[in-house]
Regions:
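Active-site-adjacent betaalpha module
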Residues: 2-16, 64-190
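A short alpha/beta connector and helix-capping loop motif
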Residues: 14-15, 31-57
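Catalytic-site beta-strand/loop segments enriched in glycine and acidic/polar residues
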Residues: 15, 20-23
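Short beta-strand segments at enzyme active-site cores
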Residues: 19-20, 55-61
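Short acidic, Gly/Ser-rich segments with clustered Asp/Glu that frequently serve as metal-coordination loops
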Residues: 24-29
Length: 190
């Protein structure tokens, strides 16, 4: 059973990185600048998660219509990563996902993906309601329209979800410059 205490910092031993619906047809309708930022930050977060042995979960919203997971995500998933298909907007409703999380025994959900105001928002709120510590990586989520993105951030804060950026996640996971992975991971952003 995951600990009941609420941590205000991302904890490498208690985190699970969840990539929500970064799929071909959703990415294709994002502004170029936005999708480039998402690609860069996805690379940083997945590289760090893999090096630090943080479990990774990816979800796909109705892949028949929205396509598969983008290659820039798929190429970084490892043999321990799990992918779940869903039709519900909240990833929590994907068949088997909640059971998998219970097996992992992680209390913190670090969320990134598409779209900010729909699937990321509903996933974050439902996980918060279930008692998880939810951190949304604000520079690793996106919406087609800026107003949708901004409204999602406001709503997430109102719901008690922690907002942070990619660098914050990375350095909270590392906690100290003496961490054995510090030099390799710091190169990703410096």
């Amino acid at each position: 059973m995951a600990p009941e205490t609420k941590s205000l910092l991302c904890d490498v031993k208690n985190s699970c990185l969840m990539i929500v619906d970064v799929q071909e047809k959703l990415s294709a309708v994002m502004p170029e600048k936005v999708i480039n930022r998402l690609k860069t930050n996805t690379d940083v977060l997945l590289t760090a998660a893999n090096q630090l042995k943080i479990p990774v979960i990816a979800t796909m919203q109705y892949p028949k219509g929205l396509g598969g997971i983008e290659n820039f995500v798929k190429d970084k998933l490892n043999e321990t990563s799990k992918c779940f298909e869903k039709t519900s907007f909240s990833s929590l409703e994907a068949e088997g996902l909640e059971d998998h999380l219970k097996e992992l025994d992680k209390k913190q959900i670090i969320l990134m993906g598409l779209e900010s105001h729909i699937c990321v928002l509903q996933t974050a709120i439902e996980f918060t309601e279930k008692g998880y510590d939810v951190f949304v990586v604000s520079d690793a989520i996106a919406s087609r329209k800026l107003t949708s993105y901004e409204t999602a951030l406001t709503r997430l804060e109102q719901a008690g979800v922690w907002l942070l950026n990619t660098e914050s996640v990375l350095f909270e996971w590392l906690r100290d410059a003496s961490h054995p992975n510090f030099k390799a991971l710091a190169k990703l952003i410096l």
